[in-house]
């Protein structure tokens, strides 16, 4: 969802073109110690689309009945073992994705959608949901930070990039969009899409 702020060094575009849906959706949002980077603006936009229910992947909540699942950022690397043990929830998410369910994931949420997550050098590669055919690692972590402009299917979206994690073999899936810094320089961070994920 586009943010409503105009970032420095970017042209004015229709960032206020967001129109709430007439159909009210059921939206499930992961919220617990592993998934807690939740921006108020995202909740405001999602609230305009429908009713929100929170669930906890770390503490083993079932996946709520939903039209959209939002997996925000956080620290899944600190809870990789606990997440790995949530087989029922991970299977429910895989089934949901394969049957066309809509999942919006960013940062830590995307890490949960990969095949595995390795938290440290020499550490265990814990199996995650496996929805995306990628492996995520904190080994060699470095900060990826800055305002971003994304070109996707004729739309321009704006936001920011902030993460330390890396995807092993990021070209295993093609990026569906190009990303640029606020100054217009292309960045290599991919944007992944699989079905409605």
What are these regions (language model features)?
Residues 1-26, 137-197:
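Amide-donor transfer/coupling interface in amidating biosynthetic enzymes
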Residues 1-56, 70:
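C-terminal accessory "lid"/substrate-recognition subdomains
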Residues 30-33, 57, 72-74, 115, ...:
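Fold-independent oxyanion-binding glycine-rich loops
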Residues 36-40, 87, 156:
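Electropositive phosphate-/nucleotide-binding environments in soluble metabolic enzymes
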Residues 55-64:
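Short acidic low-complexity segments
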Residues 67:
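Conserved acidic residues
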Residues 75-149:
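Cysteine-nucleophile active-site neighborhood
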């Amino acid at each position: 969802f586009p943010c409503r702020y105009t970032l420095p060094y970017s042209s004015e575009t229709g960032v206020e073109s967001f129109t709430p849906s007439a159909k009210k959706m059921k939206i499930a949002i992961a919220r617990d110690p592993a998934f807690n980077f939740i921006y108020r603006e995202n909740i405001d936009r999602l609230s305009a689309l429908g009713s929100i229910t929170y669930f906890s992947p770390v503490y083993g909540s079932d996946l709520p009945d939903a039209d959209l699942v939002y997996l925000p950022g956080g620290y899944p690397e600190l809870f990789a073992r606990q997440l790995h043990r949530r087989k029922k929830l991970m299977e429910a998410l895989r089934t949901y994705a394969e049957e066309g369910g809509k999942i919006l994931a960013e940062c830590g949420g995307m890490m949960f959608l990969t095949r595995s997550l390795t938290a440290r050098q020499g550490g265990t590669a814990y199996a995650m949901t496996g929805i995306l055919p990628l492996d995520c690692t904190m080994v060699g972590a470095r900060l990826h930070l800055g305002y971003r402009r994304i070109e996707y299917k004729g739309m321009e979206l704006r936001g920011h990039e902030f993460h330390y994690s890396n995807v092993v073999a990021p070209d295993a899936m093609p990026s569906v969009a190009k990303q640029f810094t606020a100054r217009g320089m292309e960045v290599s961070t991919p944007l992944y899409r699989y079905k409605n994920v």
